Amino acid sequence: MGEQNVIRLRGVTIYHTDDPFGSRSEKKLLQQGELILSDLNFDINAGEFVYLIGRVGSGKSSLLKTLYAELQLIEGEGYVAGFDLRKLKRREIPMLRRRIGIVFQDYQLLTDRNVFMNLYYVMKATGWKNESEIRKRIDEVLKLSLIHISEPTR
């Protein structure tokens, strides 16, 4: 993994299964689970903000849960903040989660805070120190969100 890559995925395929940390048997998953995402390949570098936008059921949350080690990576190579998702031990999960920030669209937000403050807390918790840079980055993300919301659907 390159030094600038915070996230690197190669050939990642994600299945929905009722047993996310159970058997690594692909055959079992194919019999029990539904294919969600296939052959993902991408890098996210340090300092980049990334949006996952797609239809309901397209695999956005499954991908985030895999990156956040809530779902186990079964197929492909995945590295997050220097951790190999295929070899991640349970005791390493909190360390991984302290190194990245993921904001879910709904159920995992701090309900007594607005979107700005949810993003702010993630950035502070992951080591961002410069207040003006934090505010600038969050403002950029929020402006992109408002542009997306204000565009008519086709």
Where are these regions (language model features)?
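Conserved ABC transporter NBD signature motif
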Residues: 76-84
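Conserved ABC ATPase "signature" region
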Residues: 83-84, 132-150
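Short coil-to-helix segment of the ABC ATPase nucleotide-binding domain corresponding to the Q-loop/switch region
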Residues: 112-121
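ABC ATPase NBD coupling module
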Residues: 85-101, 131
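Conserved beta-strand
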Residues: 9-12, 24-45, 76
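Helix-to-loop junction immediately C-terminal to a conserved catalytic motif
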Residues: 68
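The feature captures the beta-strand-to-loop junction immediately N-terminal to the Walker
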Residues: 53-55
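ABC-type ATPase nucleotide-binding domains, specifically the catalytic core motifs of the NBD
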Residues: 17-20, 120-133, 144
